[in-house]
């Protein structure tokens, strides 16, 4: 049985997600101790529970310790089965963090899958759904992943209610040496149950910030009605992204500029990937045939924690050379 220390490095939910995903794909049972030990509320939160439950269903796993607040679980997988699955997080828990747990196993399933997740599409401390769709999945398609993502409804904190459908076909993943891609900036500025000018002002502010620096941006707007109220903006170019969320009392212009500034910082780096993508791609590259290489704009503790889990499962397959990450 693989033993993982959940307090390693940043000690967050990413260790859990990567460990469960790799357990499903490799068929190796795993014990994860000290889950989220470095967080104010240690142990499993509702969101982690839902991700593990989904992985349990698709891999016919036996799981011990699956309850809120649990600081240790044992996950013993069977074989991964494709099919139609639904996950309702029940809160504004992030839909993309569920995908981080189950997308990798579904790429190695016995047949096509459709996964519909209800929860938060645009929430703090998680990749926005448009980033996952336009940056993460783009990088994974280069490896051979075949998946499509549809945003059916948006969900914001605290009510959630967003709905996203991910279609996955089993694929033979191959390593890629990624190069930086320079493209026009694209994006989406959205608001729900708010006046349409909120989305327009976010977009205009982001566009102006970038164009003042010689960067052209095409940003569409979405004005929606739904269960939850909120706004946000996501920008992307090649393998890099930037985003910001609206908050009560925060001017739309500030939201737009925050997103533009975060993308601009990434674009000023010579690296192929932004720091978040460098983290997210790692488990997929580890299970692909052949060698994957990319440079990251910043080496983070999140990446180091992910590498720790991968190397514990598979041997020393992830190496850092300065800001270059090599996976083979």
From Swiss-Prot:
User: Which reactions are catalysed by this chain?
Assistant: a 3'-end 3'-phospho-ribonucleotide-RNA + ATP = a 3'-end 2',3'-cyclophospho-ribonucleotide-RNA + AMP + diphosphate
Active-site residues from the entry: 302
Positions bound to ATP: 100, 276-280
Record keywords, A-Z: ATP-binding, Cytoplasm, Ligase, Nucleotide-binding
Its chief place of residence is cytoplasm
Q: Please name every pair of cysteines joined by a disulfide bond in this record.
A: none
Compartment(s) of residence: Cytoplasm
- Which terms in the Gene Ontology molecular function aspect does this entry carry? ATP binding; RNA-3'-phosphate cyclase activity
Q: Report any one BP term from Gene Ontology.
A: RNA processing
Q: Which GO terms describe its cellular component?
A: cytoplasm
Write down the EC number. 6.5.1.4
Question: What Pfam families does the database record attribute to this sequence?
Answer: RTC, RTC_insert
Q: What NCBIfam families does its record include?
A: RNA_3prim_cycl (TIGR03399)
Function field: Catalyzes the conversion of 3'-phosphate to a 2',3'-cyclic phosphodiester at the end of RNA. The mechanism of action of the enzyme occurs in 3 steps: (A) adenylation of the enzyme by ATP; (B) transfer of adenylate to an RNA-N3'P to produce RNA-N3'PP5'A; (C) and attack of the adjacent 2'-hydroxyl on the 3'-phosphorus in the diester linkage to produce the cyclic end product. The biological role of this enzyme is unknown but it is likely to function in some aspects of cellular RNA processing.
Would you identify the family this protein belongs to, as annotated? Belongs to the RNA 3'-terminal cyclase family. Type 1 subfamily.
Name of this chain's protein: RNA 3'-terminal phosphate cyclase
Q: Which organism is it from?
A: Archaeoglobus fulgidus (strain ATCC 49558 / DSM 4304 / JCM 9628 / NBRC 100126 / VC-16)
